[in-house]
Structures are given as C-alpha cells and as structure tokens.
Amino acid sequence: LKSTKIYRSLEELSVYELNRFDKFIQSPYFNQNPQIIQLLQILLPYLKKNESEELPKQNIWGIIYPEKKYNDARFRKLSSDLLKLFEQFLAQQIYDANPIHQANYLMESISSRKIEKLYNTVVSSVKRLSARQLEQSSSFFFYQYQLEKNQYNLTSEFEKKFKKKSKYSTLNIEEIAKNLDIFYLGEKL
C-alpha cells in the first residue's frame, strides 16, 4: 500500500495538514462514504509516525470489510475515491486562503441566482476586502477586474429587473477597464 499514489501523496503533508484532511474527510458535505473515513483512520497513525512497516492491503480490507472477501478492484476504487477527496482538499485549501476568490464566486452566485437582498452587503464587503489587500501583483488586478465585472453585471441585472436607475446606478466601467489594463501591463512586463 505504501507504493500507492494516495499514500505517497499523503506522506507529503505535515501532521497539522493531515489533521485538517481528516476533518475534511469527516465532513458529510464533502464525503458520504464511511469506508473512506475508515481507510484514512487506518493510514493516519502510519503517516504521522512515518513508519516504514508495510501495510498489506488485505489486512486493511479486513478491518474495513470484516465480513467480505478481499476484492482488489473495490480496494483500488476506495483508494481512488480517497485520492479524489485529497485533490478536492488541496483545492479547497487554496480557495480558503484566498478571500478575493471567495468574494468573486459569491458575487457570481448572487448574480446567477438574482438575490437582490445580498447585493449591498456583498458589494460593500468586497470593496473593504479589496482595500485591505496589501499584495498588488498582476493577479490582484485580474481578480479586481473580475470583481468589478461581477459588480457591473449585478448592478445592470438589478437595474433591468426594476427598470430604473436609482439604487444601483453607479456603474463601474472605468474601474473594470483600469483593472484589466493594469493586469495586462503587469503580465506583459
């Protein structure tokens, strides 16, 4: 088992990251398969102690499925499912670490669902978040461009809905163009 892709991948994590992955796997939102939880629980002590002792697949199978005969195809499927969840965990870590991504996806979601009640609070929180960003690399301006574009889409969507230009009339076309230009120049240089 130690030569499998999932085991080798999990070996790269620190104990802290392994604990976070364990919490991720325990979440019913991300994982509804209790056998995957069991598999990880069996692997965790070996991973945390960095033991070189081999883990026979048949022994692990016997712990997870005590009443069933070893089935290599099902065991590989279980390992593959754990690997997919691990990949999802890695992506989730990046998402959680980037509040601008989160704000951008939130604005997209509000726009696609046409949830007018959240418009003002989300736009103001996005503006506060943008103002607090210290790093202003070219990717920052790309995300700013996306945020401004989503704000524009939200604003124009609600103006269409109410057929008036009072509450949402501050269109941000100049900001959209400015952020896209800065991103382009930053990438070009």
Predicted stretch roles:
Residues L1-L189:
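Extended alpha-helical scaffold regions
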